[in-house]
Amino acid sequence: MDEIRYPIGKFQAPAAFCEEDAKQWISDIRQIPAKLWEAVSGLNEEQLNTPYRDGGWTVAQVVHHIADASMNAFLRTKWTLTEDVPSIKPFEENDWAKTTEARSLHIEPSLQLLEGLHERWAHLLESMSSDDFQRNFYHEGTKENVPLYVLIAMHAWHGKHHTAQIVSLRQRKGWN
């Protein structure tokens, strides 16, 4: 089950900031929309409404979730760059995945949103200094200060993680 749920493994937070790692995270963030488009290309409505695992979200819900999470992460980035240790509220991703548009809207609006958002986010990240990446926000859910570089690393992993779930489902089902 872990291979299905975590096809690229669980997220491992970096212990320290490294500029070379940051370049890779930014590249990953920029590429997520194209890789996600490729992963869902040619899927019909029935396939889009198939859970990627037993008890998991449907492919469409995963796509909408990536958009939700990316919007949150982009805003967290902006707040962290413009405020002194802003307090960030967590979002209840399972509840968000049950909202009407996450359950019934076609995936194209979320894919289009991701294209523009990730291009904008990557552009912002490329302009940041080493000190910017080490700025912190306070996460109300974990009650911890989180460095921005950890958020960026996590979201680079996050997009690849969910895209791999969809690719894995396609392989298991023979949806080539």
UniProtKB/Swiss-Prot annotation:
Binds 1 zinc ion per subunit. Keywords: Cytoplasm, Hydrolase, Metal-binding, Zinc. The keyword Hydrolase applies. This is Putative metal-dependent hydrolase GWCH70_0602. It is an enzyme of class 3 (hydrolase). Its EC number is 3.-.-.-. GO terms for cellular component: cytoplasm. The keyword Glycoprotein does not apply. Its main location: cytoplasm. Zn(2+) binds at H65, H158, H162. It holds the Pfam family DinB_2. One of its GO terms (molecular function) is hydrolase activity. InterPro entries: DinB-like, DinB/YfiT-like, Put_metal_dep_hydrolase_YfiT. Its cofactor is Zn(2+). It is found in: Cytoplasm. Homodimer. Possible metal-dependent hydrolase.
